[in-house]
Amino acid sequence: MHTRAIYPGTFDPVTNGHADLIERAAKLFKHVVIGIAANPSKKPRFTLEERVALLQLVTSHLDNVEVVGFSGLLVDFAKEQKASVLVRGLRAVSDFEYEFQLANMNRRLSSDLESVFLTPAEENSFISSTLVKEVAHHGGDVSQFVHPEVAKALMTNV
């Protein structure tokens, strides 16, 4: 049985969609590691440390969830964390092709690493970090898409 899973991402910022998937994963696995990718090529708005802190805040009520920043290959991070499952979110059919390729690449790099795909609740299916940042950038109210502390951080980091 798989007891340790990783939910990787940039989480710039963490959204209600991410939080929804984390809650679902926490019910399915004994321990969930949220792996926050440093990913400097994406030019994140928040530093790795800020993203870790925001995710720790959002997941503080989940005893079996741990938040860890990482750089390098995801499969190497999974080995370090002794995880055998990657949790990935699928918002729409358009996400599937990329996620399918990614799952096959990860399996090729580490044959004992499985990918599990979860879908968010319908009310979160359209939310993306990119859209949330865009709304915040133009002064829009993002409170319905992110945790209140994340909304506050976005407003001070525009």
From Swiss-Prot:
Gene Ontology terms, MF aspect: ATP binding; pantetheine-phosphate adenylyltransferase activity
EC number annotated for this UniProt entry: 2.7.7.3
Pfam families in the record: CTP_transf_like
Swiss-Prot/TrEMBL catalytic activity: (R)-4'-phosphopantetheine + ATP + H(+) = 3'-dephospho-CoA + diphosphate
Binding site for ATP: 10-11, 18, 89-91, 99, 124-130
Cofactor entry: Mg(2+)
Recorded metabolic or biological pathway in which this protein acts: Cofactor biosynthesis; coenzyme A biosynthesis; CoA from (R)-pantothenate: step 4/5
UniProt main location, coarse: cytoplasm
Keywords: ATP-binding, Coenzyme A biosynthesis, Cytoplasm, Magnesium, Nucleotide-binding, Nucleotidyltransferase, Transferase
InterPro entries: Cyt_trans-like, PPAT, Rossmann-like_a/b/a_fold
First-tier enzyme category under EC: transferase
Record: residues binding substrate: 10, 42, 74, 88
Keyword Cytoplasm recorded: yes
Protein purpose: Reversibly transfers an adenylyl group from ATP to 4'-phosphopantetheine, yielding dephospho-CoA (dPCoA) and pyrophosphate.
Oligomeric and partner information: Homohexamer.
Family under the similarity heading: Belongs to the bacterial CoaD family.
Protein name, UniProt field: Phosphopantetheine adenylyltransferase
Organism annotation: Shewanella sediminis (strain HAW-EB3)
